[in-house]
């Protein structure tokens, strides 16, 4: 059973009862997943950006968007409009398949993993976590990477509070540490 069908058939009715909501449409749901990677070395190394775009496309199943600098900063040696990162916004079926792979396959592969931090909510039910290396994803092989790079993953939910967001992610299978 996919994560999407499990959410619709089992998780949503359970959350409706647990949170004491009156309407099925009030139950929090995952709206989108943002996968972002900042590349400081892209200013001097153009191959880093290309490799990063390929890795993001492999991990998410969707082409990454190149993010560019808004203004020049001499201290970082970047000019306005220079490519400094990449981002992918996942919605719908791709979002659910990414979340399923991330929670069930990638997170357990993190070294010394004891669960994700339960305090990383933003106050509005959205959850953000950083991943230190891309090798936790089974799609990426050690032989094909040039250097280890991390990424930020933001899970945007329709929950209005952190408690609702945490309840949703816990039901989806997110392993929170105590």
UniProtKB/Swiss-Prot annotation:
The keyword Hydrolase does not apply. One of its GO terms (biological process) is translation. It comes from the Bacteria. InterPro entries: Ribosomal_uL5, Ribosomal_uL5_bac-type, Ribosomal_uL5_C, Ribosomal_uL5_CS, Ribosomal_uL5_dom_sf, Ribosomal_uL5_N. One of its GO terms (cellular component) is ribonucleoprotein complex. This is one of the proteins that bind and probably mediate the attachment of the 5S RNA into the large ribosomal subunit, where it forms part of the central protuberance. In the 70S ribosome it contacts protein S13 of the 30S subunit (bridge B1b), connecting the 2 subunits; this bridge is implicated in subunit movement. Contacts the P site tRNA; the 5S rRNA and some of its associated proteins might help stabilize positioning of ribosome-bound tRNAs. Part of the 50S ribosomal subunit; part of the 5S rRNA/L5/L18/L25 subcomplex. Contacts the 5S rRNA and the P site tRNA. Forms a bridge to the 30S subunit in the 70S ribosome. This is Large ribosomal subunit protein uL5.
């Amino acid at each position: 059973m996919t994560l999407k069908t499990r959410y619709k058939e089992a998780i949503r009715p359970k959350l409706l009862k647990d949170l004491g909501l009156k309407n099925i449409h009030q139950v929090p749901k995952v709206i989108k997943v943002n996968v972002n990677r900042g590349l400081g070395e892209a200013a001097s190394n153009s191959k880093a950006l290309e490799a990063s775009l390929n890795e993001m496309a492999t991990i998410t199943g969707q082409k990454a968007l190149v993010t560019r600098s808004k203004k020049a900063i001499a201290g970082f040696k970047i000019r306005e409009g220079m490519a400094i990162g990449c981002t992918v916004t996942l919605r719908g079926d791709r979002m659910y398949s990414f979340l399923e792979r991330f929670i069930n396959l990638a997170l357990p592969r993190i070294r010394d993993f004891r669960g994700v931090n339960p305090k990383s909510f933003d106050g509005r039910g959205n959850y953000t976590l950083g991943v230190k290396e891309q090798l936790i994803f089974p799609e990426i092989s050690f032989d094909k990477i040039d250097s280890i790079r991390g990424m930020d993953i933001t899970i945007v939910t329709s929950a209005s509070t952190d408690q609702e967001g945490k309840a949703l992610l816990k039901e989806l299978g997110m392993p929170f540490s105590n």
